[in-house]
Amino acid sequence: MAQIKWNKRASKQFSDLQQYLLQEFGKNTVKTFTSRVFTFLDLLLKHPHLGTLENKEKEIRGFVLHKHTTILYKEHKGSIYILSLFDNR
């Protein structure tokens, strides 16, 4: 079964985004956002080609988690690597 692996940049972006949401909107928003991310990751384990192909040569896929947030990932050797999580605004 595939595993989810976060690179350092994506992990920091996720943490920074959680911190921003906490400061601006409160704990409930952070909980909702975090839940949405991990629900998506569970779905991604079952359907790794769920996102749209953003970079064909590097086989990088993207998925809009929320109108303001996109996650970029790549499947490689049975693992799914989270490459970036960023604000679309």
What is the meaning of each model-derived region?
Residues 1-32:
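Arg/Lys-rich, positively charged N-terminal/basic patches that mediate binding to nucleic acids
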Residues 49-79:
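Basic/aromatic recognition patch in beta-strand/loop cores that engages polyanionic ligands
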Residues 42-46:
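Short proline/glycine- and basic residue-enriched helix-capping loop/turn segments at helix->loop/beta transitions
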Residues 76-88:
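A beta-strand edge to alpha-helix "cap/lid" segment located at domain peripheries
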Residues 33, 41:
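Extended, folded domain segments that form the structural surfaces/walls around functional sites
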Residues 27, 47-50:
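A general structural signal for well-ordered secondary-structure junctions
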